[in-house]
C-alpha cells in the first residue's frame, strides 16, 4: 500500500524523466515523476518500506535528506539500498552480487573509485545519520543491452530474504529468469563472435571462482588452479 510521496518539480528534468499521459476512470490525466513509498507486511513483526522512483536529476542532497526524514518518521531500523549495473559477466552463470554492510565492505567498495548513483548517496547519508545499512549491487551482462533482467531481480530478492530473515515469495520470477536465459542463449548461438566472447567470460568467471576457493582452502587448490590455467593457455596455442 502507498503511504508516502516525495513530490517536487525541482528534482527532475522532464525532458529526461518525462511525465506520462494515461486514462483514469475514462478521463485523461498526466502523471508526473515522483517518489512513492510502499508498506509491505512480510511477517507479523516485520514491515518493509520500499522507496521507488526515477533517479532524480537535480538536488540529490535535498532529496536524500527528505528520504532520511521519512525513514525516521516510519521508525526504520535498517536501510537497504539496491542497484544493478552492466558488467562483463556471462548469462550462463549466477550473476555477480556484491553486498556490503555498514561495518563490512565488499570487494567492489574497496576497489571502486568514480561516479556514483543515488543508491550510493542514500547509503552514505544513512550511515552518516546513524542508520544501520546494507548495500546490494548485482551485475548484469552488458552484451545483452537490456536492463530488464528477471535473474538479477530473483537473486536480489533471495539476498534480501537472507538479510531480513524472512522468506520472500519470488512469484513467477523463476520462470521469467529461465526465459531470460533462453533468449540470451538464442542470441549468442546466432552470433559466432558473441558466442566466443561469452565463452571467454565463462572461463574468467570459473577461474575467479577457483581463485576464491584457493583463498579459502590454500595450497592444494592453488596448484590445481595453476594446472587448469596452463591447460587453457595451451588450448589457445599460447
Task: Report each predicted region and the residues it spans.
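A conserved C-terminal secondary-structure "cap"
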Residues: 144-238
